[in-house]
């Protein structure tokens, strides 16, 4: 079953940082396995990401194998300590109906 993933990143994680992470992963050309759609934006001074995934397992695999390592790499390249970036607030919702 498809899931909607909503990430609200800690203050200090800018939209430009998420752009750099997205660019480094190259997901504009092709989404990772299980990914259906991704958007990120800024609201109320915080970066947000919203994704649609085939499953929670596909999302979790992507986070561990790709997203976290790339976020660390981008943080270091920007002179930041990856351990101090913090974790996003994550909400996972099962999708009742998906129209493509």
Show where each model-derived region lies.
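Short S/T/G/P-rich N-terminal loop/turn motif that feeds into the first structured element of a domain
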Residues: 1-69, 76-100
